[in-house]
């Protein structure tokens, strides 16, 4: 049975970018419809991405902490892992959050349409549910938040159930004895953390000379030193062939770490994501989509068609939920007639591994590429009382300052729960703070958070928790 809906705004996709845009539109008094292919709101992030992976990472952390509790005189027997119960726990987390979104959509009177949507013209789209039943949506304005999907390589037999993408890995159907992860990025390393804790022998193959290539090498080096105790990293090595056989998946590699064919019980392909721009017939609405599937927008998130906007993964890197949320707010407010635009100074990035690798603002490699006059200040967690007491002293807080103005350009943290410490650094960059502003802010002791203030003291030459390389310089200047 076909239906037709007329609305002021339709949002295509209900991930963090999409539902944030829809809810903001509704809050601003706009009649809003949201179209989503999943049976629940939340998109990839809540259903098969950010949230379920964090639930499993929490399980992994509990397992690892129990293993090492004997250092403090607490002894646990070998954990008995019931996959069905672990899976149920993960799904309960997802259900709680997606259920909350459904309640908020209802409270805001946002109409939810389930189905895959495609444009038919610049003011119409059609969403088809699982049975093929169409719902036609006539709109004044549209916000495209159609997201992205995992990259698939033509030489890999992706149809084999032992070859996974990130969605498959999160299903937790089994714990393979030997798991290869193709790609040393955030998604691959997070899932490697989970499966290693659950009992898999994990190997990671990465083309670049470091994992998490976007982060600075000194930051990643601290992570690498710890993770190599758990699973094997094969850097500067590429996969040349993948063959599925009855007794396993055979992967041929060549490069610095391996020139051989190895057998695995499962392979996780985590080499990035591609935008869904070519899957929604955007061209029928007049919206331009580039060869890669991205839709280009201006600072108000407008496409080349003035009443059609795009947000989230589909508009370009970084493909991060928190970026998409802010883009969604901008699009909604512009449609409502407000003067708003998207121009953040910083977008934080976090690998929720153990330890976490997190950074915000400019990296040191970016400063070098841009020819900036900068200075780095580092505070090692080996000098942090809280880190030592919490047995996570193999970490570091790093700040990057403009050498002339002393303003904060960027920062990175590697350590347990390091991502939780990024907020102050991001705010400092947005507000134009300098090193003195941070150093003179009293940070609670003992906390991991105080490492940010102590790194600023290193730059200022006022540090007393470490040998002060600038002490003599300061005395002379007086």
Swiss-Prot record:
Q: Which SUPFAM superfamilies match?
A: FAD/NAD(P)-binding domain, FAD/NAD-linked reductases, dimerisation (C-terminal) domain
Q: Which residues bind NAD(+)?
A: 183-187, 206, 239, 270-273
The record describes how the cofactor is bound as:
Binds 1 FAD per subunit.
Any one GO molecular function term: flavin adenine dinucleotide binding
Where in the cell? Cytoplasm
User: What's the Enzyme Commission number for this chain?
Assistant: 1.8.1.4
The domain of life is Bacteria
Q: Name one Pfam family in it.
A: Pyr_redox_dim
Q: EC class of this enzyme?
A: oxidoreductase
Q: Which cofactor does it need?
A: FAD
Q: Name one GO cellular component term.
A: cytoplasm
Q: An example of a Gene Ontology BP annotation on this entry?
A: pyruvate metabolic process
Do you know which Gene3D superfamilies this protein is assigned to?
Answer: 3.30.390.30, FAD/NAD(P)-binding domain
Q: Which PANTHER family match?
A: DIHYDROLIPOYL DEHYDROGENASE, DISULFIDE OXIDOREDUCTASE
**What does it do?**
Lipoamide dehydrogenase is a component of the alpha-ketoacid dehydrogenase complexes.
Quaternary structure note: Homodimer.
**What's the name of the protein?**
Dihydrolipoyl dehydrogenase
Source species taxonomy: Bacteria, Pseudomonadati, Pseudomonadota, Gammaproteobacteria, Pasteurellales
Q: Which gene encodes it?
A: lpdA
């Amino acid at each position: 049975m076909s239906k037709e809906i007329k609305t002021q705004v339709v949002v295509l996709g209900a991930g963090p970018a999409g539902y944030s845009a829809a809810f903001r539109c509704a809050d601003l008094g706009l009649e809003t419809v949201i179209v989503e292919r999943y049976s629940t709101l939340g998109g990839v992030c809540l259903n098969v991405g950010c949230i379920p992976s964090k639930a499993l990472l929490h399980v992994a952390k509990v397992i690892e902490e129990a293993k090492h509790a004997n250092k403090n005189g607490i002894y646990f027997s070998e954990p008995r892992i019931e996959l069905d119960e672990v899976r149920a726990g993960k799904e309960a987390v997802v259900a709680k959050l997606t259920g909350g979104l459904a309640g908020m959509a209802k409270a805001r009177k946002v109409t939810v349409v389930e189905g895959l949507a495609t444009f038919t013209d610049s003011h119409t789209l059609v969403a088809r549910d699982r049975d093929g039943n169409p719902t036609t949506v006539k709109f004044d304005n549209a916000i495209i938040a159609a997201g992205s999907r995992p990259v698939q390589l033509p030489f890999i037999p992706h149809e084999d159930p032992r070859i996974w993408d990130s969605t498959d890995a999160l299903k937790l159907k089994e714990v393979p004895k030997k798991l290869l992860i193709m790609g040393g990025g955030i998604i691959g390393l997070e899932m490697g953390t989970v499966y290693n804790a659950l009992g898999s022998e994990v190997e990671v193959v990465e083309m670049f000379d470091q994992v998490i290539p976007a982060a600075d090498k000194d930051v990643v080096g601290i992570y690498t030193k710890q993770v190599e105790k758990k699973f094997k990293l094969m850097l500067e090595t590429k996969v040349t062939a993948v063959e599925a056989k009855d007794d396993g998946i055979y992967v041929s590699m060549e490069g610095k770490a391996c020139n051989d064919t190895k057998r695995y019980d499962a392979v996780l392909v985590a080499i990035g994501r591609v935008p869904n721009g070519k899957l929604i017939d955007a061209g029928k609405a007049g919206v331009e989509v580039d060869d890669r599937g991205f839709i280009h927008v201006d600072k108000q998130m407008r496409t080349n068609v003035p009443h059609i906007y795009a947000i989230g993964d589909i508009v370009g890197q970084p493909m991060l939920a928190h970026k998409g949320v802010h883009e969604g707010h901008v699009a909604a407010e512009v449609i409502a007639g407000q003067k708003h635009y998207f121009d953040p100074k910083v977008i934080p990035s976090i690998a929720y591994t153990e330890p976490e690798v997190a950074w915000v603002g400019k990296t040191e490699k970016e400063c070098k590429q841009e020819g900036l006059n900068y200075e780095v200040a580092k505070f090692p967690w080996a000098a942090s009382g809280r880190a030592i007491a919490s047995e996570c002293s193999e970490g570091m807080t790093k700040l990057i300052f403009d050498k002339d103005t002393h303003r904060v350009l960027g920062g990175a943290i590697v350590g347990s729960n390091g991502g939780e410490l990024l907020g102050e650094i991001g705010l400092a960059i947005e507000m134009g703070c300098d090193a003195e502003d941070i150093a003179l802010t009293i940070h609670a002791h003992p906390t991991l958070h105080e490492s940010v203030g102590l790194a600023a003291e290193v730059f200022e030459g006022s540090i007393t928790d470490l040998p002060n390389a600038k002490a003599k310089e300061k005395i002379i200047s007086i």
